[in-house]
């Protein structure tokens, strides 16, 4: 895997992104209807027959700045894919993309994202940008980017929230439209704390997407605490964009 990771990083650094970067989609489901309402775009590295998970190369690209061209490339390819879907089938789905602080530090990020969206005739209201990490005192450009994205109609989410303490610290920086709870929130040792966190979220009226849904007990527990949306192996693993198109973007018969 080390050789494959090196290949992916080199593809980004040499601007040969199409040779080493691709994306998959993990469907997001309405928990009450067991219906797919969209999907999360997830970057993957590719080298020969190997699929390289993002944890192998993202941190390195964040250090070198390669995350910027890679992020733009994935966003552009995802927008093109979504734009190719039948008009009637892309009016309602929600697609989520992960955005790092390094990207948000770039003052031109929101302008590029909105320009790409406009060129593909896509509506901002169909997208959620998940903020994957941030420091307690972000640069001014971060808030400016979030402002511009929000004003344009893109919904924002804090990603990977695993505790009430983390949630409150994130909301002190920016109040988002969604909270994405980490899969660890559903483990037996954390579930009671998760219920308390959900009670707090319900009081401030923010929608939740829960990761790591693996059984019907998870579904019923989340529904009882006001969670509408989820993703996990009970519904689907991350799948190729071609599979997502065939499975979830076809007209009802």
What residues fall within each predicted segment?
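Inter-domain helical "communication" segments and dimerization helices
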Residues: 1-22, 66-69, 87-90, 118-119, ...
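Residues at or immediately flanking beta-strands
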Residues: 20-22, 56, 92-96, 126-128, ...
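A short, well-structured catalytic beta-strand-centered motif of the EAL phosphodiesterase domain
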Residues: 22-59
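Catalytic core of bacterial c-di-GMP phosphodiesterases, primarily the EAL and HD-GYP domains
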Residues: 68-141
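Charged helix-capping and loop-helix junction motifs
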Residues: 111-115, 143-144, 191-196
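Hydrophobic positions in alpha-helices of CheY-like receiver
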Residues: 117, 149, 197-201
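Mobile, glycine- and charge-enriched loop segments
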Residues: 146-153
């Amino acid at each position: 895997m080390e050789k494959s990771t090196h290949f992916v990083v080199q593809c980004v650094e040499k601007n040969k992104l199409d040779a080493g970067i691709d994306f998959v989609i993990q469907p997001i489901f309405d928990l009450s209807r067991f219906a797919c309402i969209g999907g999360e775009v997830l970057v993957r590295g590719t080298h020969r027959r190997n699929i390289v998970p993002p944890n192998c190369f993202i941190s390195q690209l964040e250090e070198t700045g390669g995350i910027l061209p890679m992020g733009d490339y994935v966003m552009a390819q995802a927008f093109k894919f979504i734009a190719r879907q039948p008009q009637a089938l892309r009016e309602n789905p929600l697609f989520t993309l992960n955005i790092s602080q390094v990207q948000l530090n770039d003052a031109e990020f929101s302008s590029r994202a909105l320009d790409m969206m406009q060129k593909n005739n896509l509506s901002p209201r169909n997208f959620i940008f998940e903020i994957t990490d941030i420091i307690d005192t972000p640069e001014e450009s971060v808030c400016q980017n979030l402002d511009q994205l929000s004003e344009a109609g893109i919904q924002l989410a804090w990603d990977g929230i695993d505790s009430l303490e983390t949630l409150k610290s994130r909301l002190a920086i920016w109040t988002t439209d969604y909270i994405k709870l980490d899969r660890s929130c559903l483990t037996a040792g954390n579930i009671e704390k998760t219920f308390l966190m959900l009670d707090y979220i319900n009081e401030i009226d923010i929608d939740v997407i829960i990761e790591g849904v693996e059984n019907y007990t998870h579904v019923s527990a989340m529904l009882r605490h006001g969670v509408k949306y989820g993703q996990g192996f009970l519904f689907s693993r991350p799948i190729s964009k071609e599979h997502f198109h065939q499975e979830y973007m076809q007209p009802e018969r």
